[in-house]
């Protein structure tokens, strides 16, 4: 095929696919149609970032890589090119199926897409909007929070980390109650070591992937008495959580990251499953959430070589 034919076919195909997204502005539409590789979208509040995610998912399911690839159907002819050029100008409904067949390139099964957000409310809204746009085709998309995604991953393979798959999840109240008991038993004054402060130290350590033992040893080596006492509480907290087969909210993401980075076969399973990873409100991600998203997308993560190009789209507020 000539270079001119290929270029014209690619342009016509993209024009046809764009017809489904004419309700978006030019920048939003470009973001929706750019499907391959990493993509960062920064915009202010109320600019339609979530709308872009939803339409991007719709495009992936219907057209796959069609708008963002140089590949042509092996059977493409000049007649097909003329058809697409005409359809882009006058999209007749009775020709829609032929247009779809010429434009779709490896349309994505819904279960190969994961869209992660931060709150259950936001995840539920994402699911509802996807269902309104796609119908039952949206059911298998993982529209989910970081914590819920981690729970699903851990329920399948957490035994690799020495926990039972029926692990209990401690909420904030559970964690606080346990820490209060620990501090009392260790004779740590609650005015000098408020339980919330101790838990905050532990949370920051987990986000940096610093274990209780490493935290304590670092404090002991530096001679920081306060941190050494907090390290004792951290170790006792971790031991009791393990004995109870329990994980707190930080543990969910921490252990999901550990599971993926320490078990190449588990990592490979999820990287093969999820061809596309989308993250909402990216400006709110912490270190562990970044590591989890990177691992799922196939990016380099803690020395683990990427299995493939990372098809990850993140949207964030540049004012936050």
State where each predicted segment sits.
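P-loop NTPase Walker
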Residues: 2-164, 169, 244, 268, ...
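Conserved helicase/translocase P-loop NTPase motor core
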Residues: 23, 80-83, 87-99, 146-150, ...
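ATP-hydrolysis module of ASCE/P-loop NTPase motor domains
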Residues: 35, 118, 137-141, 158-251, ...
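The DHp (HisKA) dimerization/phosphotransfer helix of two-component histidine kinases
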Residues: 59, 204, 208, 258-259, ...
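Hydrophobic residues in beta-strands of the RecA-like P-loop NTPase core, especially within AAA+ ATPase
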Residues: 278-285, 316
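Key residue(s) within conserved catalytic/signature motifs
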Residues: 283, 303, 308
